[in-house]
Every structure is written in structure tokens, then in C-alpha cells.
Swiss-Prot record:
Disulfide-linked heterodimer of A and B chains. It is an enzyme of class 3 (hydrolase). The lineage of its organism: Eukaryota, Viridiplantae, Streptophyta, Embryophyta, Tracheophyta. It comes from the Eukaryota. The keyword Lyase does not apply. It catalyses: Endohydrolysis of the N-glycosidic bond at one specific adenosine on the 28S rRNA. This is N-acetyl-D-galactosamine-binding lectin subunit A.
Length: 28
């Protein structure tokens, strides 16, 4: 997720965090 957070550096990062949590649910 480091690469994702690297690209998402701004306001959208907060929204993307929710998307990342969804990925973690599928990957974990």
C-alpha cells in the first residue's frame, strides 16, 4: 500500500483510505 499512498497525497488520500481498507479485507 506504500505505492498507493505515495500516489495519493492530498485530500483524496482520506477517501482512498476507505478503498484501501476494502482491499485489505479481500487480501486478508
Amino acid at each position: 500500500y506504500d505505492k498507493v499512498e505515495f500516489h495519493i497525497t492530498g485530500x483524496t488520500k482520506d477517501t482512498y483510505s476507505a478503498f484501501i481498507q476494502s482491499l485489505r479485507t479481500h487480501l486478508s
